[in-house]
């Protein structure tokens, strides 16, 4: 065991930071939309089922590998793999996944910060709906402006990490996550008290099995599976690092349950902000960047004190993006520290330069390189980077973590259970061995294959 390993100062720090890593933009711009589309609370029940049987076991395995090895993904497999095996190659894929994720996430984080400023300075006041959409298009067309905000995002993230695990990452993420919840609750109260919001609340929360059947049960199940899987940032070792920073006082199943509960709470509350507000103003919610950067600014424009609520919303979105960015930057820094024995400050300086350079193709893909459509007409560099991470590295990485923890040729089931169950709290059900070894890998392979099918053949 590494005696110099940094530690979280509290259990709350570990739970909030891990939840911060999981809570990302998909909680806001995808979850409310698919929940409304696929039957409201009926869909949420299916989603929660898959969160428990699909997302949680893999997260527990990632934490176990991190805690047992006391290393980041770069070295954890080296420490735990049986001699002569090649499991450590998974670590290099995980490292690539963290860098690739940040190659486009930093740009989107920059958009959020830019929109906080736009809201505070009243840039949207008096604009028509088309003009509001034009603000976003205009931003995408300016490589210099987007680069500046991307660099600000990178510098904020690495500055927090440079202060150290307890004084930086833990202390600042705790404050940020607390503010995120307070702002989210305030936005919720405002949204559900808008005139005409009741219809939206009913659409979002009342189970509608007819809507579910209409959409097709297979499609609903796959959407729930995908959301449960992708919401937790699994498969690239992003969670594993936080396992290496905690003691063996608590079992990992109970901690994972708390993290998943926080992630789901944010997703559900985000829906209570968005869906009732869209219904109140008779606007189709939609999903993705269009929802956040065009639909919602139009709603804030029509709302009393809309400038204030709009600014609060984009501060909330900035915190959601930055909590993930800081968590992944902590991973990226720890790779250099584990592999080359660097000091934290040196790892920070090296990676600031690396991430800024690596983030440029995403920025330029919206303007100077917009003719480059890697995944077919209308696609961008960002779509390609997202596809590599979401459709390939996350499912395949999760599959490798799973096989490593269940196969006798890897770390093995007994070692995994011993680690996961160390400490007080909820234990991992040993009866799930057959399910985890034989059925769960097939579910992940199904998600992987269906991702390709939807992308290229649907």
Which residues does each PLM region occupy?
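Membrane-interface "cap" regions at the ends of multi-pass membrane proteins
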Residues: 1-29, 58-63, 67-92, 247-251, ...
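Loop-to-transmembrane helix boundary motifs in multi-pass membrane proteins
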Residues: 7, 13-15, 21, 143, ...
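Membrane-embedded translocation segments of transport machinery
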Residues: 2-4, 8, 170, 174-322, ...
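Transmembrane helix-boundary motif of multi-pass solute transporters/channels
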Residues: 12-50, 237-243, 254-257, 261-262, ...
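C-terminal membrane-solvent junction of multi-pass transporters and transport-like membrane proteins
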Residues: 90-93, 340-352, 386-444
